[in-house]
Amino acid sequence: MGTRASSITALASCSRTAGQVGATMVAGSLLLLGFLSTITAQPEQKTLSLPGTYRHVDRTTGQVLTCDKCPAGTYVSEHCTNMSLRVCSSCPAGTFTRHENGIERCHDCSQPCPWPMIERLPCAALTDRECICPPGMYQSNGTCAPHTVCPVGWGVRKKGTENEDVRCKQCARGTFSDVPSSVMKCKAHTDCLGQNLEVVKPGTKETDNVCGMRLFFSSTNPPSSGTVTFSHPEHMESHDVPSSTYEPQGMNSTDSNSTASVRTKVPSGIEEGTVPDNTSSTSGKEGTNRTLPNPPQVTHQQAPHHRHILKLLPSSMEATGEKSSTAIKAPKRGHPRQNAHKHFDINEHLPWMIVLFLLLVLVLIVVCSIRKSSRTLKKGPRQDPSAIVEKAGLKKSLTPTQNREKWIYYRNGHGIDILKLVAAQVGSQWKDIYQFLCNASEREVAAFSNGYTADHERAYAALQHWTIRGPEASLAQLISALRQHRRNDVVEKIRGLMEDTTQLETDKLALPMSPSPLSPSPMPSPNVKLENSTLLTVEPSPLDKNKCFFVDESEPLLRCDSTSSGSSALSRNGSFITKEKKDTVLRQVRLDPCDLQPIFDDMLHILNPEELRVIEEIPQAEDKLDRLFEIIGVKSQEASQTLLDSVYSHLPDLL
């Protein structure tokens, strides 16, 4: 029992100890959170207002209040106070607001649409009046003009819109356009062969194909025992030719010693395809007059490539006294579709011909590549392998020199190394900056720490190693790392160097002299110290004088998160916003147009009526923003910061 009681007592004491430790940890965590909240409370007061709110200065107390914005289609009729919320009212007729706002009156709608324009969007509480040209017209030089009408033989290539005219093109081969139009494209010619018809008249760019029935001889269901029917595409008529069993007058049927051969002949002056009138056929030698009945004249007008000759086949008369039988028979022909094979239409065979041509080209390319590769394998490389290795090593050795020249800024005949400038300022923070830039490990950082005596030497070697290690190293990344570690003072020094307003110590920014200007700069090693650092006086070439330092990265350098410093050129003229920062914002806005109205709405409570009138008279939004920078920049630093906060909140791409 004593042992059991002692164990229970020990467990209770352990549980009390664990509870005390847990309570102590919870209390410590709460204290740490409270400390962090007190640290971050002061910067949070300077951050921009939350979305959906605006700042208002109470005229009675002078206190800056944060009020909720009014929704789109309304305006603030009464601002909020310490005791009441803001009051919103609907926009009156003829005014509008597109976004939630904190303005005291709505924007006026645009003027009514001039004739002949029509309204796409009417003037409403949420939208401004928008005018467009009516259908069939497009806007040109502020007026509406009718769409161009494509003439005959031309078709619409691109349909016209409200802002662009119609584009016409001449009808290609196989297409036509027979009416002037501003909406119709070229139509394809009628496929006569596909409809089992003949092309009577080929089409042009202005007319369609003229199709007709095919000419053939029908032998089914004849009207009589000796009748042949002719079909023509234009003259659908039937001509009956009497049978040869008809016994004309004056012909002796008992004459068994003579034979008659009746055949139509085509004279040299008559075009093929016509059947001349043969009224009689005489046999002068025998003295017997044999006449045939006069058949009706048949005239056929066909295309030049369809010509037919009607031939009357001869018949033999039997000597036994029977009636002679002379029948008119059509020549034996194949199926009418056989005529289609006489004409080669390239449009029908063009697709598979193109496919065959591409396959042939592909085969030729493969064969040539195989032959070339086989020759290369047989001959071997043209150069000695050792020479190739030497060239590769030379290219690698030249890379650090090019990277190093990238970071040199020429000023007053001296080459100033930006990396050395940063290394001289960051001090012991170079470790954090180097790890941020390269994602380096502690082992790599320790290598630089053991190889040099001073912090600026370690920082310079680490930054050089960063530029050589990553070819994508840029000034924007370096500035981002400096801001990440709250070294805006170094960024301002770089700005001052570019603006030529800061007196720098040239002995600290001198470049190390290399033994030979042509020898490649080796990769900085942690075990080698930088010695013999002297001032490098370099006269830049005309190309170096004309080119801008870090042309593609000037915008990130000049884009700051606070108002201007006293060293900037524009601040000396009395403005709290630097010219570089303003130009950066305006350049970005002009390159990528966006809606700037929310920025103007945020600044209305700072502008007086005269300044507001001046800004409203400017037509272009970018010019309005430029003027707004000039007006707000000379008011106060707080107003300038409010404008910058509004710009960065509504244009997040600038960050």
Curated annotation (Swiss-Prot):
Task of the protein: Promotes apoptosis, possibly via a pathway that involves the activation of NF-kappa-B. Can also promote apoptosis mediated by BAX and by the release of cytochrome c from the mitochondria into the cytoplasm. Trophic-factor deprivation triggers the cleavage of surface APP by beta-secretase to release sAPP-beta which is further cleaved to release an N-terminal fragment of APP (N-APP). Negatively regulates oligodendrocyte survival, maturation and myelination.
Consequence of gene disruption: No visible phenotype. Mice are born at the expected Mendelian rate, are viable and fertile. Mutant mice display an increased number of T-cells in the peripheral blood, but only a minor increase of the number of T-cells in spleen and thymus. T-cells from mutant mice show increased proliferative responses to antigens and produce higher levels of IL4, IL5, IL10, IL13 and IFNG. Mutant mice have normal serum levels of IgG and IgM in the absence of antigen, but produce higher levels of IgG, IgM and IgM in response to antigens.
Intervals holding TNFR-Cys repeats: 50-88, 90-131, 133-167, 170-211
Extent of Basic residues compositional bias: 330-339
Membrane-topology annotation of the record: Single-pass type I membrane protein
Domain Death positions: 415-498
The record's account of how the chain is modified after translation: Oxidized in response to reactive oxygen species (ROS), leading to endocytosis.
Keyword terms, alphabetized: Adaptive immunity, Apoptosis, Cell membrane, Disulfide bond, Glycoprotein, Immunity, Lipoprotein, Membrane, Oxidation, Palmitate, Receptor, Repeat, Signal, Transmembrane, Transmembrane helix
Known tissue expression: Detected in spleen B-cells (at protein level). Ubiquitous. Highly expressed in adult spleen, thymus, testis, prostate, ovary, small intestine, colon, brain, lung and kidney, and in fetal brain, liver and lung. Detected at lower levels in adult peripheral blood leukocytes, lung, and in fetal muscle, heart, kidney, small intestine and skin. Detected in T-cells, B-cells and monocytes. In T-cells expression is highest in Th0 cells, intermediate in Th2 cells and lower in Th1 cells.
Signal peptide: 1-41
Lipid anchor positions (S-palmitoyl cysteine): 368
Residue stretches spanning the membrane: 350-370
Cysteine disulfide partners in this protein: 67-80, 70-88, 91-106, 109-123, 113-131, 133-144, 150-168, 171-186, 192-211
Composition bias, Polar residues: 241-262, 276-302
Residues on Extracellular side: 42-349
Location (main, coarse): membrane
Keyword Glycoprotein carried by entry: yes
SMART domains: DEATH (SM00005), Ephrin_rec_like (SM01411), TNFR (SM00208)
Glycosylation, residue list: 82, 141, 252, 257, 278, 289
Protein name, UniProt field: Tumor necrosis factor receptor superfamily member 21
UniProt-listed Gene3D superfamilies: Death Domain, Fas, Tumor Necrosis Factor Receptor, subunit A, domain 2
Residue ranges, annotated region (Disordered): 222-305, 318-339
A GO cellular component entry from the record: plasma membrane
